[in-house]
């Protein structure tokens, strides 16, 4: 239904508004689990305005979800390193890249992405959790203790903190 509403709007608009409609269309396609179509929608993104990093991030997510992880990770890496990109979006791109790399059993590359996430940002706890999992997946259980122990100082209602609280006893038992 959302796509039907956006279709005539997209045809009649120009410039920034057209870019916004294009991004909304891609987000709707992602929500409908149509990542190939979402990636294609954002493939020709030419705008250089403030929306570009968001379009690139969402295209990267669509590429990863559509089975093209190498292309998606390359784009996530670009967004995650770009100083023009807003810091929270850089963190989110690095978080997405880190967890994608954990899924493909590349813990060392994942750890590098998690290490780029700011400790004072909105994705800090998820980044610390991921850093711990990257260390654990690489067989460095003692290295997982650092980020997970740091998480225990955060509010316990955070799911990343809860997961670390569950993982810590296992790691302690294995390393003693």
Which residues does each PLM region occupy?
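Acidic, polar-rich low-complexity tracts and alpha-helical solenoid repeat scaffolds
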Residues: 1-176
């Amino acid at each position: 239904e959302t796509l039907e509403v956006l279709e005539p709007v997209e045809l009649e608009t120009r410039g920034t508004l057209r870019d916004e409609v294009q991004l909304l269309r891609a987000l709707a396609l992602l929500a409908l689990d149509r990542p190939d179509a979402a990636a294609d929608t954002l493939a020709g993104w030419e705008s250089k305005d403030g929306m570009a990093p968001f379009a690139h991030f969402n295209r990267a997510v669509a590429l990863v979800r559509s089975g093209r992880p190498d292309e998606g990770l390359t784009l996530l890496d670009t967004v995650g390193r770009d100083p023009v990109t807003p810091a929270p979006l850089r963190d989110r791109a690095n978080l997405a890249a880190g967890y994608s790399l954990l899924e493909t059993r590349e813990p060392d590359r994942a750890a590098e992405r998690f290490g780029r996430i700011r400790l004072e940002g909105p994705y800090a706890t998820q980044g610390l959790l991921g850093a711990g999992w990257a260390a654990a997946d690489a067989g460095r259980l003692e290295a997982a203790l650092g980020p997970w122990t740091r998480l225990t100082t955060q509010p316990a209602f955070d799911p990343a903190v809860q997961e670390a609280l569950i993982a810590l006893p296992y790691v302690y038992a294995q390393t003693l």
